[in-house]
């Protein structure tokens, strides 16, 4: 039996996690430990972990390779691994868990491996599954490894969202880059405004509290991750330009001779764009979130 045929028939695989010391790398190790039917053995490589395995032996040992490297380095790491794996890649499944998809999927496809691009739309959870979360799935090339990937995706318990890699990047730019940029811009304006956060808290509205909480959530993360999300794809940079243009329009409208005549129709057009159902549901979610910010009563 060939190596490739053997890979399709055995229920378990030898899994290599590239980026095993990172947050999702550690989550993956826990996930495979909780799903032993998927992985006979899991080994990892990470420059931050001196005890991890070097990439060269992993390239010839692994059946399944999962790249969980920092988004700014993913394509380069895939290229280095491909140079080590060479013909062995044709018998392997390569997956990546990164926030952009077109470039990593293309880099993996160039190797000859079977390819699946993944983007969990959440930070690594404390649980060993993704129940209640969305997982974008960008299929690059699957044949022999399709049964294993089906079992893998089922075990995640996530809501699967199949997308073309380029379409993922277009949507992610609006879902992630645009939102992160808006929060960063607000924080930059606040930092330059001359007041401390404690001083602003004394006059804070519930909406300000929610916006500030979102900003603090962003600041609690890895600056390199957010810098990459904002800059690595043309789609993300286009979203930033759209935000700039929208802010410029608002400034011009507010500075105009008749600001209400400019602003009110625009806000009404946004109400029509969103629709009554979305507005009602979003306002209800806002009220629930505000309740969550209130200090507990005695």
Please state what every model-predicted region is.
Residues 164-298:
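An accessory alpha-helical subdomain
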Residues 2-60:
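NAD(P)+-binding Rossmann beta1-loop-alpha1 motif at the extreme N-terminus of oxidoreductases
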